Amino acid sequence: MPYQIAVTNNSPRFKIVLPFLSISLGLIIALCGDSFKSDSVSYLDMGDYFFQGDWRAILNGLWSPLFAIVHGLSRWLFKPTMRWEPTLVQLTNFFVFVSTVLAFQFFWSEVFRLYRLLSQREPQPSSSCFSENEFWGFGYAIFLFMHLNLVTCTTPDMLLSTIVYSSAGLILKIKLSGATSLRFWLLGLLLGVGFLTKAVMLPLATVFLMAAVLSNLRQRLLLFYLLAALVAFAGVVSPYVYELSREKGHFTTGEAAKLNYAWHENGAPFTHWQGEIAHLGKAEHPTRKLFSSPLIYEFARPVRGTYPPWYDPSYWNGGLRVQFELGNQLRALVKHLNTYLRDLWSQNVLIACCLVLVALRQDIRPILHDFLSVWYLWLPAVAAFALYGLVWVEYRYIAQFFVLFWAAVLTLVRLPAHNHSRRTIRAITIVAVFLLTIQIGTNLVRECIDGHRAASLQMDIAEGLAAQGVRPGERVTLIDADLGAGWQKLARLVVVAEIPFEERETFWSLDIAKRNEIYQVLAKTGGSVLIAPEVPHWAPTTSWQRVGSTPVYIYRLHP
């Protein structure tokens, strides 16, 4: 039987204003943001190839397909020029953020229903609680604090937030309103889409399904409902896994976990692994080393992309094996624990205000009991923290899971009834929202300024290269390739060889005769120019041309 809950709707307009305010702030930050961060270029390449008719382009061992398809669709529909491409990328990111806001709205409405239910079941029904306005205001302040600075990040993390909030909200819906085959089927469907968004959702899907099942053990048809969820999940995941396995020549659900563990825990290089670490395996098809001092690597074929070594690292790292080493793992856990503590410290306002609100209940036993009773709300977050903690942690990976954790904490706020309880809750809520708003505003201004500066530089480089005759589709070579350099994508370049960052000073220290030898080697790769994103102030730049007023220089390999 579903629970019967009396929810007080004392300000329906407030719940409408909050998402519109969030969407407006998201639009502001999107329009002045940096379009190309981290792994963005690889996702954009995948989407472009997919909508050019190569559907197998999304069968990538590292990057999941859904985010690439979303961006590929917008670029295929609008076909932006170079000048408008960053704007289109950011508008696409913005619409992903809108989906996250809507998913959070659904999730938070279910959290509020749960909070009201728990409050009504208190042995002292007159206990003081959040009003509806306070609960929603606090919730959106947390949401914006966690997510607003990620709007411009062209990675699938915001899209995954949409899936996480929708799935968590649906679990609460099942808990509060009763299980049905349709709700479990939708949950399985969402989790399958989550896997197509980021591979980490494959193990996390187990946790979400476990939360849905174990929180509804009294349901008579529970096994049937679970089967409906599993069928939906398999229906989404299986075709992709089948085709990916065919593409890679062996069964695989993706290589993200293996590659990240090898990079972060085993010390394998992110690019140009040559099998130099013997216990990690033998390189099956590494990038080709053309020169030893400085090191030069060529990768014109068979993988395409703006920067092929990062378009599909699973190909170039074929033969790589991960090794579990207890010492390395313990060091990684300590390092990642420090990362979590640093992220928590940035949330000191939340910690302080929630700690005061919960501590005012005075008795620790009911607090622990109540927190454990909403395990289905915080368990997926703890599981995500544990999974990332084993391998690698970045804030953008875990922002949505912090929100789930704080949602569970806010359900504990039920103070003993006395004259000052309501005023205490209201005062602390106002202080928390006010301080979080200041931090949100500060982050918004910083993101707008830094994002606009970075986006302008990328555009200046791309347009400067075009002005100097470097055409779209042209093959180029690089000194110190930047994995997140959007100017390469904007200029439609194809990087075929590079001198890595750590070899930069070696190259610039060479005499003219030796450098001419390097130029001849690079020319044989098919690259028309050598591009140096930065040149040391002491380095000779004879025969090099500066790209406008940017720090980039080019050298023509084929005069």
Annotate each PLM feature.
Residues V7, S126-S131, S167-R183, G194, ...:
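Membrane-interface transmembrane helices that cradle and orient dolichyl/undecaprenyl
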Residues C32-M46, A57-S74, R83-T87, K248-E255, ...:
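Extracytoplasmic catalytic/substrate-binding loops of multi-pass membrane glycan-assembly enzymes
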Residues S38, W63, N149-L160:
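Short acidic/glycine- and proline-prone juxtamembrane loop motifs at membrane-interface regions
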Residues L91-S126, S166:
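Transmembrane-helix motifs of polytopic, lipid-linked glycan transferases
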Residues G139, L144-M146, L159-S177, R183-L191, ...:
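Specific aromatic-rich, kink-prone transmembrane helix
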Residues E247, L259, T424-A485:
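Membrane-embedded, lumen/periplasm-facing catalytic core of multi-pass transferases
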Residues N266-I367, V374, E498-E502:
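Lumenal/periplasmic acceptor-binding loop at the mouth of the active site in multi-pass
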Residues K282-A283, T287-S293, A455-S456, A466-R504, ...:
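Short periplasmic/luminal acceptor-recognition loop of GT-C membrane glycosyltransferases, typified by
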